[in-house]
């Protein structure tokens, strides 16, 4: 592996929040080696020779992680190999071990033939131009060559003990835990049991084939098994983790899905009860009901761009104690480290639930609600998605409304809102609508339809 083979490094795998590709097509053992070399050089340039490395349960993990570590060591880094862990445990390692850099080898919720790299350098989760800078290092051969070393480090036990020491339940709860055969299975069911819950496990054996359902709790069809098991067992709540455990999906005791922006309402209320005036960050896809709720409980609401690395950067800038996005990433800085952690978020949810006499269904039903659409995706090209958004920001006529253009165009009316933004990970436009009545929802959709077709008449719109 002395010579760099550019064919093993397609530009397409260097994405907005991570590096991700299809194993055997755009991602090979050699790719992992050179990515390790680039990350190592960048970490050293930022004064951080120590790098933690973890992997999820994908079948390609052992092969790729071996080469990733070899690349880091050849760059001159000292690697702490934390083994098969969920992503939050790797983020935890990059907070509590000597070094503040880390690489998680994970395909997250993508199909089983994908894998990828989530990267933290000197405490900062890489995004956008920082990820492109790694590709530039490789193309210009701006690399280091030295001999580092690798040691195996047990992090899960420490992660487990710290959460069990922090989160205290007031009563025993019956909880169904669906790990979707992802990496959360190595710690989540055991942890929730250690908190004092009765755990009914579903698909908690790590299996990179994902034989039961896709490990993406953001899609309702992947929660069907969980909902059925919650109803069948009379559980207090159901929890589902994505493939690498940095997101959590929630269903109530009656089987209703709790969408992440409503979960954030509960966390906001809880955190603000102890930290009046705290800032809470949420992404542009979240309900309009969140801002008034945060303000009513004495907090400051800040809407920001979608993307876990972008939210973490904003939290650091502002000193925010809590953030969340519609995809299910929840970031808790109060009593924790501020990274997205589906497992710790689940523990904090159980703590809140254990202290109330209300059922999960009644607890969430008390929050204001609107009629909303699921996420609507429209296929376009990668270039087209940005030019359409530019044209909408520049030329569209939305009527009497409040516009937010930090990430696409969000148009807030008196009784509802609509959003169109370019996905950072796929060649699609992402839309979402919410309103207080079906008629208003339809009216807002019609406005968006008219404006979209004005700037791009060829678009195939499903609404």
Swiss-Prot record:
Keywords: Alginate biosynthesis, Isomerase, Lipopolysaccharide biosynthesis, Magnesium, Metal-binding, Multifunctional enzyme, Phosphoprotein. Coiled coil: none annotated. It comes from Pseudomonas putida (strain ATCC 47054 / DSM 6125 / CFBP 8728 / NCIMB 11950 / KT2440). It catalyses: alpha-D-mannose 1-phosphate = D-mannose 6-phosphate; alpha-D-glucose 1-phosphate = alpha-D-glucose 6-phosphate. One of its GO terms (molecular function) is phosphomannomutase activity. It comes from the Bacteria. This is Phosphomannomutase/phosphoglucomutase. Its EC number is 5.4.2.2, 5.4.2.8.
